[in-house]
Amino acid sequence: MLQGKTIIVTGAASGIGAATAALVSSHGAEVISVDINIPRTPVGRFLQVDLADRSSIDRLVAALPSGAHGLANIAGLPPTRPAEAVLKVNLVGLKYLTTQLVPKLSDGASIVNLASLAGLGWAESKDAVLASADLDFNEVSAFCVQHGIAGGRSYFFSKEALIVWTMQNRWTWRSRGIRMNAVSPGPVDTPILKDFIATLGARAEEDMKTMDRPGKPSDIAPVVAFLLSDSSAWIRGTNVPVDGGMYSNVLCGIHGL
């Protein structure tokens, strides 16, 4: 379903990004792996980038070929990192890379953003999310102070804003057939799972008890691959939960179902 396509995967050095790069490659795609860290066994061509740095992103965009058929925005920082860094990488840098790269993408390309179950409460943060629409790298520190975004809250906010941005761009590039969707994993057994447990404490332990098991990167990658493929051409601006039923569990609790 991806035979002959060129797919750019950020965060390809580990976890869900590495699993996605390997999977789409196995389906015949030419992969360009992107990360700040050098993968032990890179899939396809590797390019290094710091998504917290505008100039680094500019260099990446210049180095990437024209005509790519897909962009999987999977790179991200966990909630234990400084709030400013989390927002720069998970939101501002991701958005900047995407908008700069769109002119070089092939018509009919697919963009898939890795959001999170942590972004479920975006509606309660709507004012701050809307205020972040044009947030630039040099404005992140002041924005965090103004909106009280500190500690682990930065991760939740970055994913809330990413889900909203995905929905807002449901038709932005429709004239070229370029679509955008998001995937929201629940807890996944990756190198940063311990960071979530450290941040959420008892809440994380309770979620683990509710779930039969944490997810695996191999649970998430096939959904990303599907959204990158032509089989998902009629899916636009959608956030797909891949969380073992946790999203439905939360909704049932909220609505007494």
Can you describe what each PLM-predicted range is?
Residues 41-55:
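Rossmann-fold cofactor-recognition segment
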Residues 236-257:
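Short C-terminal tail/terminal secondary-structure segment
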Residues 174, 179, 235-237:
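Short, small/polar-rich loop/turn modules that mediate ligand/substrate recognition or access, typified
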Residues 78-79, 84, 107-175, 187-188:
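Catalytic loop of short-chain dehydrogenase/reductase
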Residues 6, 13-14:
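Conserved glycine-rich cofactor-binding loop
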Residues 120, 184-195, 248:
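Short, flexible catalytic-loop segment of classical short-chain dehydrogenase/reductase
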Residues 96, 154-155, 160-163, 182, ...:
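C-terminal helical subdomain
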